[in-house]
């Protein structure tokens, strides 16, 4: 069947909009063969209070997804990762409130083993855990899928990993993090 221009216009209004307005970052550290993934817990009186999650956040107007990832990691954890990867598959979910399919670019970020975590007021605890423990703690299936992708695409060491390292792209685009959220001193935070 051959499509005519007016046929396409008749179909398009029925298509559910797709948008990328959020990012997800799986921050990890390694020492030798030991590897730990950072999870942060949503603070009380916040939406999803008590839920363990990777770093997540919104993409601001005019901001790229990777720049949003850098900014959110800095704002929510105080960390400045040394290496970054864009995972092959974004997370995706349907938002019934807005009748949109949301696409969430997923990144992996490596930090130094000794880097201190300073949480924003959005979270009340953090924990560095094994990949298996992280998969048990997170709420969403898409986050468990991303943990498997992190293992297979970034950490396996195989040259055929589908994740693309984007560390050099950050320097080229000057995706410099800026801190805008107030922080409480790290001494008040408890590790889980």
Positions of PLM-derived features:
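Conserved N-terminal beta-strand and adjoining loop/helix that marks the start
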Residues: 2, 8-38
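Active-site segment of metal-dependent pyrophosphate-handling enzymes
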Residues: 74, 78-114
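Short aromatic/basic micro-patch
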Residues: 53, 101, 128
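Conserved Nudix-box catalytic region and its N-terminal flanking loop in Nudix hydrolases
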Residues: 34-75
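Short, well-ordered beta-strand micro-motif
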Residues: 27-29, 41, 106-110, 128
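Short, charged/polar surface micro-motifs in flexible loops or helix N-caps
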Residues: 31-34, 45-47, 60, 100, ...
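NUDIX/MutT-family hydrolases
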Residues: 106-108, 116-150
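Charged phosphate-binding loop/patch that engages nucleotide di/tri-phosphates or the phosphate backbone
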Residues: 139-192
């Amino acid at each position: 069947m051959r499509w005519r221009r007016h046929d396409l216009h008749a179909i398009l209004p029925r298509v559910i909009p797709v948008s990328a307005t959020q990012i997800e970052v799986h921050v990890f550290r390694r020492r030798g063969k030991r590897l730990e993934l950072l999870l942060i817990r949503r603070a009380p009186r916040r939406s999803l209070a008590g839920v363990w999650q990777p770093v997540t956040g919104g993409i601001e107007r005019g901001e790229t997804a990777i720049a949003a990832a850098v900014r959110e990691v800095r704002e929510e954890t105080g960390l400045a990762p040394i290496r970054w990867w864009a995972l092959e598959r974004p997370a995706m979910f349907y938002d019934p409130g807005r009748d949109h399919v949301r696409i969430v670019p997923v990144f992996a970020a490596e930090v130094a083993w000794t880097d201190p975590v300073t949480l924003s007021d959005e979270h009340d605890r953090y924990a560095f855990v094994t990949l298996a423990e992280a998969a048990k703690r997170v709420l969403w299936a898409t986050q468990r899928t991303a943990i498997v992708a992190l293992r297979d695409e970034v950490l396996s060491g195989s040259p055929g990993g589908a994740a693309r390292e984007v560390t050099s792209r950050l320097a080229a685009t000057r995706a410099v993090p800026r801190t805008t959220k107030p922080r409480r001193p790290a001494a008040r935070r408890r590790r889980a």
